[in-house]
Regions:
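Nucleotidyltransferase catalytic core that binds NTPs
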Residues: 1-135
Length: 135
């Protein structure tokens, strides 16, 4: 029987319980969870027009922590939305489901035009990197 391959992505900067909850939920939809870690090192504008703050951990530190999560089968770095789109386009036949944050239901996201089944995950917690930094 074919294994279901799932994909999700993010910055995973200052890994917190909310990230782990999200990855656990992602793993429920697949047998093999592939996670892209955005390597961007500076404040960046997202496809939906929002901005992400400059990461605190280096890309390799964020990759290390993400890959160590027991729900992640494989993690890799990608350098920005153009590289993510290229990866998704080249692998759309190998990815059975893409799990995207529920906040993207109302906003555009990279690769939404590709032939990959999309599931929007829940965010039923108050954890956030921004709030953690403020505390």
């Amino acid at each position: 029987m074919k294994k279901i391959v799932g994909f999700t992505s993010g910055y995973f900067d200052i890994m917190h319980p909310g990230h782990v909850m999200m990855l656990k939920e992602c793993k429920r939809y697949c047998d093999y969870l592939l996670v892209g870690v955005n390597e961007y090192k500076t404040k960046t504008k997202q496809p939906d027009g929002r901005y992400k703050n400059e990461p605190i951990w280096t890309p390799h530190e964020r990759l290390y922590m993400t890959d160590a999560c027991k729900y992640v089968d494989e993690a890799f770095l990608y350098d920005g939305e153009k590289e993510l789109y290229k990866f998704l386009k080249n692998n759309q036949d190998n990815i059975d489901v893409r799990i995207v944050g529920a906040d993207h239901k109302e906003h555009p996201f990279t690769g939404e035009d590709l032939n990959i089944n999309v599931i929007f995950n829940n965010r039923d917690h108050d954890y956030s990197t921004t709030n953690t930094i403020k505390e």
